[in-house]
Amino acid sequence: MTTLAQVLEELSLSELSNIHMSNTGAGGIRGEYKPKVILHINEGLLRMFTRIVLAERDVLIEQHDHITNYHLLSRFAAYANNGSMEPYLYIRDLPNEKFKDDVIKILKVFDSTGARLPLNDDNKDNSVFTPQNNVLQIPFPETGICVSVLYQAKHPTLTVNDLDKTVELPDGLFECLRAYVAYKVFS
């Protein structure tokens, strides 16, 4: 498990070793440059997690007969946003597993029996649709019935206060991430 601090150290000892922001290869990124480098790390992670399915999560959606478009946003979650002013909190998250606004793309949808529903198939009566990346459209919703949505998820955004947090990336992609950060720093 590689932490953000380790990624910064690796950058300072390799791709960024010959520039001022890396303490000239002494094993760290100077404090005033960390926010900029971490911004590039976040951009690189978002690009990789968007192009390759590196994280999947699922969420339960409770249907209401008058709602056809279900926006996968935390303001519609039961626990993620306790102060929500939304009248219908249809995302059924849990207190210890709150929904995060991390949807890249909806991948699969399952009904309450576990059967996979057709996705974006106009030829199927029970098909559900994705008019936007984080919107599930259910043409014929049934109040109280839940569907499970499997989606491609983003990497959590990292900050300068997250140096001990794990960068959730397969080992083989860290070199790609470092190369992307170097490209952004030098361009």
Annotate each PLM feature.
Residues M1-S187:
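Glycine-enriched, solvent-exposed interface loops adjoining structured elements
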